[in-house]
Amino acid sequence: MTKNFRIGQIVPSSNTTMETEVPAMLQAHSSLRPEDRFTFHSSRMRMKKVQKEELAAMDAESDRCALELSDARVDVLGYACLVAIMAMGRGYHRVSQKRLTERTAENGASAPVITSAGALVDALHVMGAKKIALVAPYVVPLTELVMDYILSLIHI
């Protein structure tokens, strides 16, 4: 029996990789399980440069993006900007996920939301991580912000 899934993604406007990488992963999954079919839908938050001052302004657009994707009746929604979430402070991934899920419900198309930051923190907990090595495409202050966020939540 065929199962159709609509995958929604909130992505920074300057990101040029996620909209090719995620569909490729979904297609690879479908090749292993042909009964699972996916459509991929994205909405963009405006951001030209990954700088702390732009991250909060960009995150403010995530509510609009969640509404747009809920118009498409997506089954799940991912927020694909780890540093934007982490720049907002300790535990913000939970706040964001809850708020965006509420926006989809208010639009009559409730969809669970996961952020890349939340997925990373959850995965590190599940794995019982004792050490972390981080390679990041950010300037040193933003990389330190990411490390501080992770360390504050997983207690290594």
Predicted segments, located by residue:
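N-terminal beta-loop-helix "entrance" segment that forms/cooperates
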Residues: P34-A60
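Conserved small/polar residues in nucleotide/adenosyl-binding loops
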Residues: I154-I156
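Hydrophobic, well-structured mid-protein blocks that either form specific transmembrane helices
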Residues: S96-I150
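Glycine/small-residue-rich loop that forms an oxyanion/phosphate-binding "nest" at active or ligand-binding sites
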Residues: V76, V83-E106
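Glycine-rich, highly charged phosphate/nucleotide-binding loops
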Residues: E54-A72
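Gly/Ser/Thr-rich loops at beta-strand to alpha-helix junctions
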Residues: V11-T17, C81-H93, L120, A136-L142
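N-terminal basic/disordered segments at the start of proteins
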Residues: T2-A28
